[in-house]
Regions:
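A short, flexible loop at the N-terminus of ABC-type nucleotide-binding domains that lies
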Residues: 1-22, 27, 70
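The feature captures the beta-strand-to-loop junction immediately N-terminal to the Walker
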Residues: 34-36
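Helix-to-loop junction immediately C-terminal to a conserved catalytic motif
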Residues: 49
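Conserved ABC transporter NBD signature motif
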Residues: 54-73
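ABC-family P-loop ATPase nucleotide-binding domains
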Residues: 82-122, 126, 131
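Catalytic Walker B motif of ABC-type/P-loop ATPase nucleotide-binding domains
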Residues: 144-148
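Helix N-cap at the start of a conserved alpha-helix in ABC-type nucleotide-binding domains
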Residues: 155-157
Length: 181
């Protein structure tokens, strides 16, 4: 089970960014990381995910170094990141089927059913973002980490996203969200 994610700095890297001292994310709640552009939100998220190993932070999940236990727990993790894109030629339906191969209970919530056959590269930025959010949440992961999920979303999609996060809270699931809002 993914819980008790803690971050311990080995050395502070910047004067105004990522100045963190022994921080833990509380399980079964939503935590917002709020900051301006360049504050280090994405760097922190990528460090937690093990994507950035060049920053001097020690990230642990249940007192086990995060990079050592990502693979066994990947089915319990959902991620929304602008770093992730999908190969050309795949449509949303293909991507949901791919996710269903690993996660049997994969269900879309934000993505319009009439766009399922449209290829990823032909989706608008807002449609791509809704698809990324849906793929991250569709298997009901124990932990979802979202880096600026509000990017390119119109107001009604923002409201639906907020409702999905609230629903996760009632289900005692953990969400970590980096945002400027």
């Amino acid at each position: 089970m993914i819980s008790n994610i803690s971050i311990t700095p080995i050395k502070t890297m910047f004067k105004n960014a990522l100045n963190i001292h022994n921080f833990s994310f509380k399980s079964h709640t939503s935590t917002a990381i709020i900051g301006t552009n360049g504050a280090g939100k994405s760097t922190l998220i990528n460090t937690i995910l093990g994507i950035r190993s060049d920053y001097n932070f020690k990230v642990q999940n249940n007192n086990i170094p995060y990079h050592d236990n990502v693979i066994p727990q990947r089915k319990q993790l959902g991620v929304v990141s602008n770093l992730f894109n999908y190969p050309p030629g795949l449509n949303a339906n293909d991507l949901f089927k791919f996710y269903q191969f690993f996660h049997k209970n994969c269900t879309p919530n934000l993505f319009e059913k009439n766009l399922l056959n449209k290829t990823y590269e032909h989706l608008s930025d807002g449609q791509k973002q809704r698809l990324k959010i849906d793929l991250a949440l569709s298997h009901h992961p124990q932990l979802v980490i979202m880096d600026e999920p509000e990017t390119s979303l119109e107001q009604n999609a923002l409201i639906r996203l907020s409702n999905l996060i609230s629903l996760r809270n009632t289900q005692q699931l953990t969400s970590i969200i980096a945002t400027q809002i």
